[in-house]
């Protein structure tokens, strides 16, 4: 038997009176996500932690070389990690984010001991609603930005890796509508887009940025120096 609230939602969508019902639905989805993020998504899928540890090991091993050679392996490992994270997000929220790609990871030297780090992420997103099924498909682009530097203690002479903030700016998340269910009101499509924006923003803030920070902080100063490379105006060091 179809639940009453689903029938009410469907009638509201068709009649154009569903704004408050969509808000309730969206808030429920976000509550489930935040609850999962607070627990840690790794508690829902132990593979996340395994992939993350393998990513750290892979990057550390590359730093054993005199020069960190450009390779797609790190990007592939990071894609696997993010894909697994979004699989858990799908289980919690019903929003499907797949075909994750990390084209490159760049370290743009700002001095001999510091660099801006850029990690672009692309993915396909599908938003569904009860009874209606898929309402909108989106193209997702996220540009994670942070910085890394090597600081030396004036008294002890010891050096340490310092990772900057990973700002969760709305401008860093771009969504493009690829397909929408015919006949739907614009308000319903806007609901889907805004829901994804809030969802991805929460994942970036509570899951992706902390893991990028932990990854960089796990590397020693010599490895970071190799990744930074020489400061140049027009050249980026890719990993």
Curated annotation (Swiss-Prot):
Cellular compartments annotated: Secreted
Top-rank lineage group of the source organism: Eukaryota
Disulfide bond entries: 166-209
GO MF annotation terms: lipopolysaccharide binding
Cleaved signal peptide residues: 1-20
Keyword Cytoplasm: no
Keywords: Disulfide bond, Secreted, Signal
Pfam assignment, any one: LBP_BPI_CETP
Record-level GO cellular component terms: extracellular region; secretory granule
Species the sequence originates in: Bos taurus
PANTHER family: BPI FOLD-CONTAINING FAMILY A MEMBER 2 (PTHR47145:SF1)
InterPro entries membership: Bactericidal_perm-incr_a/b_dom, BPI_fold-antibacterial, Lipid-bd_serum_glycop_N
Tissue: Detected in salivary tissues: parotid, submandibular and sublingual glands.
Family recorded in the similarity comment: Belongs to the BPI/LBP/Plunc superfamily. Plunc family.
Entry protein name: Short palate, lung and nasal epithelium carcinoma-associated protein 2A
